[in-house]
């Protein structure tokens, strides 16, 4: 019977005994994804993709639709949770050398790009003051790319300005991309289970494995319940913590908000974009900031997989984390003397981590050889 085979497949899946809590974020991402699709469905049912009605339809959802306020807040804060989990998930992969599962890592990076595309499209759907400016900026950045891009932008967003067609296109994109994410996630999991997970020691764990159920199911459930608790507490008590005051006024193409800044989870990429004075160069740096993750499996030169036993690499990694935080912070600030310099230095350091990655590995190999 197929369902029994499935139960055996997942229940008796052999997993290393020593994987830590950093390995729980994958299942949390799956839960986030499911929740976003469900809440998004209920929001889309009541949403109107028209430039004149979009903002009013969202006000209608939060005020008149039963539990609409809850759907909207769960969807918005759920997206923040999604990004917190995915950034931790990626940091875990970098730290413990999980990127050496090449197929899994490449499919995961593609997933990240799709997730960012979905989140960006959802921002434009609200047609609030910050959203119109963000959509215009995104269209302008895309148009900067090449000669052909202007036509591509017109095809995707229907017009250069954020008109009714653009809202409809964004709503449709935000509706279909999550299904792509779900399909790719299943591929990601299948590719992962070809080789199995890594572990904190970065060693082969074939000699010491336990069944996924009940051990890791309950372990996953613990972190999942903590995440749900955090989510519900935030939705209940601080629903606008990640929100921008500009989102409470309707989009007006004639009035630009004082500080156009995206959601916190894009600030890091936005900071890198802003730190390059050239328009095309900025768009390129923005794309590269994500694409550079694809290089890690090919630039790993160390004989050791995990950073647990690589002190120099640990220093580099935590510098990278600090750099990420600094870029995120600097991107919230206006474009003025101290902040521009901070952004540029931090962005350079971000890219330097990936560039010096192979050299650090070779240096560590040499040091180990002499000891």
Curated annotation (Swiss-Prot):
Gene3D superfamilies: Cytochrome Bc1 Complex, Chain C (1.20.810.10)
UniProt xrefs under InterPro entries: Cyt_b/b6_C (IPR005798), Cyt_b/b6_C_sf (IPR036150), Cyt_b/b6_N (IPR005797), Cytb/b6-like_sf (IPR027387), Cytochrome_b_C_euk/bac (IPR048260), Di-haem_cyt_TM (IPR016174)
Source taxon at top rank: Eukaryota
UniProt xrefs under PROSITE patterns: CYTB_CTER, CYTB_NTER
Pfam families with a match to the protein in the record: Cytochrom_B_C, Cytochrom_B_N_2, Cytochrome_B
Primary location: mitochondrion
Subcellular location(s) of the protein: Mitochondrion inner membrane
Keyword Transit peptide belongs to the record: no
Parts of the chain that traverse the membrane: 25-45, 69-90, 105-125, 170-190, 218-238, 280-300, 312-332, 339-358
One of the record's GO cellular component terms: mitochondrial inner membrane
Stated role: Component of the ubiquinol-cytochrome c reductase complex (complex III or cytochrome b-c1 complex) that is part of the mitochondrial respiratory chain. The b-c1 complex mediates electron transfer from ubiquinol to cytochrome c. Contributes to the generation of a proton gradient across the mitochondrial membrane that is then used for ATP synthesis.
PANTHER family: CYTOCHROME B (PTHR19271:SF16)
Note in the entry: Heme 1 (or BL or b562) is low-potential and absorbs at about 562 nm, and heme 2 (or BH or b566) is high-potential and absorbs at about 566 nm.
Name used for this protein in its record: Cytochrome b
Organism lineage: Eukaryota, Metazoa, Chordata, Craniata, Vertebrata
Name of the gene: MT-CYB
